[in-house]
Amino acid sequence: ASFYPTQQLTKPNWKTYGLGWFQHDYRGNKLDFHTGSIGGLIDICGIIRDKNTAVYVFANLDHAELRHAIMYKAMDLFAFDDDSRDWHKEIFELYSGFRKKQAEDLKKSKAERVAGTSSTLSKNAYEGTYEHPMLGQVLVKAFWP
């Protein structure tokens, strides 16, 4: 299963995914969590059953991975009575590094493009209705100039 980058900070001994729930060990306990992101809204629900603790975070900023910082901080405070870790700082630094790497990769990709070349077809040539026997029809429309 593909896990969230925050696993680099929690360093679980085991991790799994089942029926919509990410699961891993956190501070010696099983943590189940589920995330959602749609239409500019995000959420995370985390449960440590053995500590009788659950955390729900809802926000109106898509891809705001601060939700992980809030969940782990709340778990530390309520399940383990521990306020020693600055989750906000750690997760901010982790994701800032990803944004920097993404910008560098884009710059490298543009620099490596073969000069004087272009796509085989114009962007508008991809417009149309496509059909798949299992998935049905999809309309592709160009929104670029």
Spans of model-derived segments:
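Catalytic loop of the DD-peptidase/beta-lactamase superfamily, centered on the K-T-G motif
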Residues: 1-145
